[in-house]
């Protein structure tokens, strides 16, 4: 959250509005989605194409024995992964983007109005989601975990949207006479 705070202070001084805070969250969550899931799935897609076209053998043939064995082991894991798990990454990213939008609004609110409790709420919320994910991942099936996180994010979005709607929007500037 300190990164959000610094970015808003440094780069959004003149444009710090509640709407821009939401867009900051969309950008933050979106780039994280691209960097974490997007690039991985492009790699998975390229690998699947190589396997399905039969060109994987030629690629494996260029590797030394140890690297080839490790690559074959990775391919086996990829090929035996249940297909719904690839879908679950998308569900997880939806929750993550919603979280980043909400966190960005809370940090904006703390900065814009000096309401430090919203900054601490953002920090606590981010910690709680990350901690719950780590703790539950070892004991709860992935589908249940993602549904729990999705439900939690729905509640967070509802609460933050109430704050957002309660905040007055600035009056539109009057057109200057020509």
Give, region by region, the residue ranges found by the protein language model.
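Juxtamembrane/disordered regions of integral membrane proteins
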Residues: 3, 37, 41-45, 78-83, ...
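Membrane-interface capping segments at transmembrane-helix boundaries
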Residues: 158-174
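Alpha-helix-centered segments that form part of catalytic cores
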Residues: 70-102
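Transmembrane alpha-helix/helix-exit interface in multi-pass inner-membrane proteins
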Residues: 26-70
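Functionally important transmembrane alpha-helices
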Residues: 89, 93-163
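Juxtamembrane helix-boundary/capping and inter-helix hinge elements in multi-pass membrane proteins
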Residues: 10-19, 112-116
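Generic transmembrane alpha-helix signature in multi-pass membrane proteins
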Residues: 1-11, 24-25, 36-40, 104-108, ...
């Amino acid at each position: 959250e300190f990164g959000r705070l610094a970015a808003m202070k440094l780069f959004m001084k003149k444009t710090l509005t509640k709407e821009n805070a939401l867009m900051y969250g969309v950008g933050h969550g979106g780039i994280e989605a691209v960097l974490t899931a997007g690039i991985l799935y492009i790699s998975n897609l390229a690998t699947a194409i190589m396997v399905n076209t039969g060109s994987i053998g030629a690629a494996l043939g260029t590797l030394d024995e140890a690297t080839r064995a490790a690559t074959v082991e990775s391919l086996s894991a990829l090929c035996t992964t249940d297909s719904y798990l690839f879908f679950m990454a998308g569900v997880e990213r939806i929750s993550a983007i919603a979280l980043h939008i909400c966190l960005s609004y809370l940090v904006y609110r703390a900065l814009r109005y000096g309401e430090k409790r919203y900054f601490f709420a953002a920090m606590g919320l981010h910690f709680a989601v990350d901690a719950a994910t780590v703790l539950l991942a070892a004991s709860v099936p992935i589908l249940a975990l993602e549904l729990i996180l999705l439900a939690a994010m729905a509640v967070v979005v509802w609460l933050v949207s109430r704050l957002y709607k309660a905040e007055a929007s600035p009056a539109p500037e009057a057109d200057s006479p020509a």
